[in-house]
């Protein structure tokens, strides 16, 4: 199975973003309508909620909607207000000892993965992995604030925004973990997610958001796919979230670790998953080196990709996703 990842630089919304949107819109439209048009919020409601909760993004949203063709359906999709449910299986850790970095494995379906890394300068410079055309799965801004999302393991969907857009908003408007916490705890999320934050001062937190209860600020450096309790046993069994959090707890206490040694550990099960058939295989390992303002993507086959704010290069990489014969590593 081949994973394609394209690195695209476009500081302001324009022709490159428009081309990417046009390529992905057929698939996104099918997903957006998967529960029927009546299940999705109307344009007026969606735009009003975006203006209320993330007003700084409104001019950008209007520009992107125009580039997307100016249609009602496209604008409703881009608002990311009350989208269909979706979930992933991820492991993430903020490290702030001698070195400061955020590392994560993103586990999802390779067929549904957008496969785009974007450098933008909308409200401030941001580098991240794209989802839903302008949302982010993880990313870092030029201030050195990094954020990463993991599904919270709760089979509940409510009224709120898709978490990738919330991640985009946080990185566009915040400079520190404290700033990000304020924003994260003030915006409704349509499903449960765990957002791990790390800033240039080494301050970290993981925020549990949910559609049916108040957010919880957890001053923890690690997260997998449950929150305070296991709410969905079937999902827990399928993704081994408790096993993975135990491994991360062990690693975070080993202060002799370096970013290179921890990165290698993230390339082994149970943190690294080969469960592609059930859409929970690891698609990439991302490490955000905060002080260097660099993003490193790595894979078990020794493929690597590095980008930075100082030298972002447009490129494309193909990765062969295979294996499953690599032993688990706990030490």
Where are these regions (language model features)?
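C-terminal, well-structured catalytic/ligand-binding subdomain of enzymes
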Residues: 1-70, 80-81, 97-179, 183-186, ...
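Short, glycine/charge-rich beta-strand/loop segments that flank catalytic centers
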Residues: 73-94
């Amino acid at each position: 199975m081949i994973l394609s990842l394209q690195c695209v630089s476009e500081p302001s919304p324009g022709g490159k973003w428009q081309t990417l949107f046009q390529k992905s819109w057929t698939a996104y439209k099918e997903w957006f309508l998967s529960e029927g048009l009546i299940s999705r919020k109307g344009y007026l409601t969606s735009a009003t909620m975006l203006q209320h909760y993330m007003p700084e993004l409104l001019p950008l949203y209007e520009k992107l909607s125009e580039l997307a063709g100016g249609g009602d359906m496209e604008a409703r999709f881009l608002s990311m207000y009350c989208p269909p449910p979706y979930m992933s299986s991820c492991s993430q850790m903020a490290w702030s000892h001698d070195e400061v970095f955020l590392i994560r494995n993103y586990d999802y379906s390779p067929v549904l993965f957008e496969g785009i890394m974007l450098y933008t300068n909308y409200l401030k410079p941001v580098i991240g992995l794209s989802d839903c055309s302008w949302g982010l799965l993880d990313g870092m801004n030029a201030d050195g604030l990094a954020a990463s999302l993991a599904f919270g393991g709760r089979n509940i969907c409510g009224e709120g925004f898709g978490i990738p857009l919330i991640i985009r908003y946080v990185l566009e408007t915040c400079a520190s973990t404290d700033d990000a916490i304020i924003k994260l705890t003030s915006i409704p999320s349509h499903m449960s997610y765990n957002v791990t934050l790390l800033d240039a001062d080494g301050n970290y937190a993981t925020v549990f958001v949910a559609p049916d209860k108040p957010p919880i600020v957890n001053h923890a450096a690690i997260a997998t796919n449950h929150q305070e309790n296991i709410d969905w046993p079937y999902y827990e069994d399928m993704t081994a979230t408790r096993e993975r959090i135990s491994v991360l707890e062990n690693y975070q206490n080993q202060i002799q670790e370096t970013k290179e040694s921890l990165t290698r550990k993230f390339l082994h099960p149970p943190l690294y998953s080969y469960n592609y058939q059930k859409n929970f295989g690891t698609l990439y390992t991302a490490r955000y080196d905060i002080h260097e303002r660099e993003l490193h993507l790595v894979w078990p086959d020794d493929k690597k990709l590095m980008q930075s704010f100082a030298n972002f290069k447009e490129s494309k990489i193909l990765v062969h996703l295979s294996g499953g014969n690599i032993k688990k590593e706990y030490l």
